[in-house]
Amino acid sequence: MTIVAGPVEQPTPPGVARVDVKTASEMFEALDTALSAGSVDLLAMVAAVSDVHLENPLAHKSPKSSMLSDLGGLQWAQERDLLGALIERHGARVPSLGFAAQTLPKEGDRPAALRSLGEEKMRRKGADALFANEVGRPGVGFESETNEGVLLVRDEGDAVTSRTSPPSMAKDALAGWILDHLLTGGVIGY
């Protein structure tokens, strides 16, 4: 197993290779190299990189007196869609799992909204499976010990099935739940 990690403080589990990167471009290159090197059971893109980057970052800290005008003049560019680009390049031989952190309206059927948003994202990227979860709600997602959401799996006929996770699962238990469903759903096999 290889982890390609951005700047995080998480320890690397024993027996796992780790490649540290700082930018989305470095992450793409490291993932592309790992996927090109041989047999891969699953490409799991479990965390997002930034959606945009500065074209020409400031070379120095901006003084308070000119900060607003300096920041207003910065040019932004959209980051490459790493999952979509890797699937386009390696998809036929590499099963893929994406994650989609979504914000939802306060009212309505949350699992149905996650299914709809997740399925659109999964199809757009060409992923075999995608876990959609809500962010911005206390107790789940970022900066929480628990999470919950909807796992979408695409079969060979392009039909999508979904399963809603149990509520507020510990993240390591949720990872096991997802892997179990990927195995039984035929996304990865042993």
Locations of regions flagged by a protein language model:
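A cross-family phosphate/adenosyl-ligand binding-site feature
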Residues: 1-190
